[in-house]
Amino acid sequence: MITVALAKGALLRESVERFQAAGLDFSAVLDPDNRQLMVPSTCGRARALLVRNGDVPVYVAYGQAQLGIVGYDVLREHQMPVAHLVDLGFGGCRMSVAVKNTSGYTRATDLPPHCRVASKFTRCARQYFDSIDLPVELVHLTGSVELGPITGIAEAIVDLVATGRTLRDNGLVAIEDLFHTTARLVGHPLALRLDQGELQSIIDVMQRSPHDAVGVN
């Protein structure tokens, strides 16, 4: 039986639609009354694990799921040994450095050395600031990172930015982009090597335009 890891949250609906196009229907996870974390497909030949975003590559890396869909930002941050298979193109946003709009900073190199930077993505932030040779103190937060500059716990933040509305509503502005992120299909390397074609048929469908995809049998 094929097991796939699906992330709760913003990527879930489109992830379910992509697997539906490949012949695996996990639409039951979209039911607001659903409380199951392991959901079988309607065809009975696969199941989905409904997990937190950051846990998708963990389940795939340890072989509890053969496939998963997760944001590139999570893959960059966690760096788990999974196979990067397809850039699915949805869920696009930017990993950015942001500051108070009254700070006067216009680029990351304007920040003072050894200032505090708040982020949920401390590995990505560290790699970026190391690349521009700017020493900073990273403050790990798990939510509402925008409060960092507002409360004074940090001079800047590194976080995902889609429309920028949340930043604007909190008096912040993005001054530098680290990278662009989209949803990616990932796989367990050994499972892919041992695959008898079933996983590859799903991957092949995922590689097509979602408008052209036809479910596999």
Swiss-Prot record:
- Is the DNA-binding keyword given for this protein? no
Q: Where in the cell is it found?
A: Cytoplasm
Pathway per the UniProt entry:
Amino-acid biosynthesis; L-histidine biosynthesis; L-histidine from 5-phospho-alpha-D-ribose 1-diphosphate: step 1/9
The record's SUPFAM superfamilies line, in alphabetical order, gives: Periplasmic binding protein-like II (SSF53850)
List cellular component terms (GO): cytoplasm
Q: Which UniProt keywords apply?
A: Amino-acid biosynthesis, ATP-binding, Cytoplasm, Glycosyltransferase, Histidine biosynthesis, Nucleotide-binding, Transferase
Which reaction equations make up its catalytic activity?
1-(5-phospho-beta-D-ribosyl)-ATP + diphosphate = 5-phospho-alpha-D-ribose 1-diphosphate + ATP
InterPro entries assigned: ATP_PRibTrfase_cat, ATP_PRibTrfase_CS, ATP_PRibTrfase_HisG, ATP_PRibTrfase_HisG_short
Could you mention a single GO BP entry for this protein? L-histidine biosynthetic process
Any Pfam family hit: HisG
GO MF, one example: ATP phosphoribosyltransferase activity
Database matches in PANTHER family:
ATP PHOSPHORIBOSYLTRANSFERASE (PTHR21403:SF8), ATP PHOSPHORIBOSYLTRANSFERASE ATP-PRTASE (PTHR21403)
Q: How does it assemble?
A: Heteromultimer composed of HisG and HisZ subunits.
Q: Which HAMAP family match?
A: HisG_Short
Record family assignment: Belongs to the ATP phosphoribosyltransferase family. Short subfamily.
Return the NCBIfam families for the record: hisG
Please explain the role this protein plays, according to its UniProt record: Catalyzes the condensation of ATP and 5-phosphoribose 1-diphosphate to form N'-(5'-phosphoribosyl)-ATP (PR-ATP). Has a crucial role in the pathway because the rate of histidine biosynthesis seems to be controlled primarily by regulation of HisG enzymatic activity.
Name of the protein in its database record: ATP phosphoribosyltransferase
| Organism field | Synechococcus sp. (strain WH7803)
GN (gene name): hisG
